[in-house]
Amino acid sequence: MTVKVPPLKCQGIKTKLANWIKDHSTYENNGTWIEPFMGSGVVGFNIAPRRAIFADINPHIINFYNAIKNRKITAGSAKEFLEHEGALLQKHGEDHYYEVRKRFNKEFDPFDMLFLNRACFNGVMRFNKKGFFNVPFGHKPERFAKAYITKITNQVKYVSQATSQYDWNFVCSDFHQVISSASQGDFIYCDPPYIGRHVDYYNSWGEQEEQELYELLKTTPAKFILSTWHSNKYRTNSAIEKYTYHFTILTREHFYHVGANEKNRNPMLEAIVLNYNPLTPIDLQEEKQLSLLEKKQREEYLLYSTPSV
């Protein structure tokens, strides 16, 4: 199934994992779809829930999507803006990029956010200790070709249509409050920052936050999926052993292309943590019948399954 790509990119975006995550979701549009760590929003955008709360601690992400919801940003206005700024970028190169970055850090205009997100280095979304966007230029002055602008405006158009059709709310909030608001029948999708990776002003993340998140998820009446990483060739995620023994874990190998650090470009075994068993009795029987060789050849496999609900 074709994945609907969001207009804002960010490191760790789950575009290539969205269908895999969606396939293991039991959300049936009866409750509210809740994302405490919206980021790009790609998973929720592909679920297309009737009711959703997309939350993030980064106000610039929330302001951008509220600008689409409130029709400040439309496909037409985004096209016009990117054509204008793209022409200036092609003419003046990095000087124009840094001029827009300076302007954004003063005015925080969501149009500038879109431009910077698509013109910066590798689509990284990073803010310094003062809360200012500080990603360098991506060194592609010809970035905003006609086809590329059309691609972005179509992405804006999808979100605009979805916010007209569905009850989607974009809120700037801490994950504690968002998860605590969930009720039975709701579905939570969590994509928190990874410890030690992509840390900045808005997404610093450590052991304490990781523990608090899992404690909240252990007690929520809602079903959830949490995206995390399991291991790479250097190390294993210690949180998997510490906090997930109550839950089901599925894994899949994935390769991230975002990040300047070569160490962060290695293949990684991604994991999703669930508080339910997504496999049917038939699936479980087939799982038992797989040979060891077949298991190794499978793209995803069940590590262990002891769901709490």
Where are these predicted regions, by residue range?
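Conserved beta-strand scaffold positions in the cores of enzyme catalytic domains, especially
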Residues: A52-F54, F170, H246-T251
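Glycine/threonine-rich flexible loop motifs
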Residues: H198-S204
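Long, positively charged, glycine-interspersed low-complexity recognition regions
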Residues: G206-V309
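Conserved S-adenosyl-L-methionine
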Residues: A18, H24-G86
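Short glycine/proline-enriched coil/turn segments at helix->beta-strand junctions
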Residues: T26-N30, I47-R51, A182-D186, K218-K223, ...
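The conserved SAM/SAH-binding core of class I Rossmann-like methyltransferase domains
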Residues: A55, S173, S227
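SAM-dependent nucleic-acid methyltransferase catalytic core
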Residues: T2-Y27, R71-Y189, P193-H198
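Short, solvent-exposed loop/turn segments at secondary-structure junctions
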Residues: S40-V43, N58-I61, A119-N122, F175-V178, ...
